[in-house]
Amino acid sequence: MNIAIAGASGRMGRMLIEHILATEGVSLSGALDLPGSPALGQDAGLLLGRQTGVAITADLEAGLAGADCLIDFTRPEGTLAHLAVAKRLGVKMVIGTTGFDDAGKAALAEAAKSIGIVFAANMSVGVNATFKLLEVAAKLLSTGYDIEIIEAHHRFKVDAPSGTALKMGEVVAEALGRDLKTCAVYAREGHTGERDPNSIGFATVRGGDIVGDHTVMFAGIGERIEISHKSSSRQSYADGAVRAARFLADKPNGLFDMQDVLGLK
């Protein structure tokens, strides 16, 4: 399978390229970056200390030529621009970008009628196993427990709460028969009054080089259950993304997530 990478000079892009080069059955066919990036024209493996024969380009059509799938961990506006070209060229997509609004998500769903797309807030196998644990816990602890979600990421992350934290909230809310849009509390300040027992709270930490920590707390009277996932590197995201790309090999179209990829549905 031929795979192109968006954001090729970024932290996640470099990790994806390294993982593809080390994985049998897949090859790097294209590397995309923003216009004006100092990496344009360089070999995609330069920062990894090796040659790939693939030059980083801002030309979407050139970067996607010969690609079966594009892996994209960029920003919503960039991903949507890539999506339009990928759809036209028939290139499938694995999307790990977070921060989409409802219109952006609708655009992904529409494009998935024509091409196969895996869209997931987190590609880690461990995180997706955590989602299943949360579903079970929420059903067992449906009454008498207050639910709070705490997430921490590096200082460079631009959206909050994280897409993974929001997905955790959606999993818990769905298991409880609630709508996260109406029960989520994203900030508390001043005299807030007593906690609404049906609410799901979020707390966000940003600092340093934290790759990604997530904890869901079920706080009852006399006990507290915490389900946590902590990432120590982006390797697990890269592994999951390449796994998702291979999953799409025989999928002509459709919108999938990592639960589909891992057979957890």
Swiss-Prot record:
Pfam families (alphabetical): DapB_C, DapB_N
Entry's localization field: Cytoplasm
Enzyme Commission (EC) number: 1.17.1.8
Binding site for NAD(+): 7-12, 33, 96-98, 120-123
Keywords: Amino-acid biosynthesis, Cytoplasm, Diaminopimelate biosynthesis, Lysine biosynthesis, NAD, NADP, Oxidoreductase
Catalytic activity: (S)-2,3,4,5-tetrahydrodipicolinate + NAD(+) + H2O = (2S,4S)-4-hydroxy-2,3,4,5-tetrahydrodipicolinate + NADH + H(+); (S)-2,3,4,5-tetrahydrodipicolinate + NADP(+) + H2O = (2S,4S)-4-hydroxy-2,3,4,5-tetrahydrodipicolinate + NADPH + H(+)
GO cellular component: cytosol
Enzyme type, top EC level: oxidoreductase
Gene Ontology biological process terms in this record: diaminopimelate biosynthetic process; lysine biosynthetic process via diaminopimelate
PROSITE patterns (UniProt xref): DAPB (PS01298)
Record-annotated active site: 153, 157
UniProt GO molecular function: 4-hydroxy-tetrahydrodipicolinate reductase; NAD binding; NADP binding; oxidoreductase activity, acting on CH or CH2 groups, NAD or NADP as acceptor
Binding-site residues, (S)-2,3,4,5-tetrahydrodipicolinate: 154, 163-164
Pathway in which this enzyme or protein is active: Amino-acid biosynthesis; L-lysine biosynthesis via DAP pathway; (S)-tetrahydrodipicolinate from L-aspartate: step 4/4
Similarity comment text for this entry: Belongs to the DapB family.
PANTHER family per UniProt: 4-HYDROXY-TETRAHYDRODIPICOLINATE REDUCTASE 1, CHLOROPLASTIC-RELATED (PTHR20836:SF0), DIHYDRODIPICOLINATE REDUCTASE (PTHR20836)
NCBIfam families the UniProt entry points to: dapB (TIGR00036)
Function text: Catalyzes the conversion of 4-hydroxy-tetrahydrodipicolinate (HTPA) to tetrahydrodipicolinate.
Name of the protein: 4-hydroxy-tetrahydrodipicolinate reductase
UniProt organism field: Cupriavidus pinatubonensis (strain JMP 134 / LMG 1197) (Cupriavidus necator (strain JMP 134))
Taxonomic lineage: Bacteria, Pseudomonadati, Pseudomonadota, Betaproteobacteria, Burkholderiales
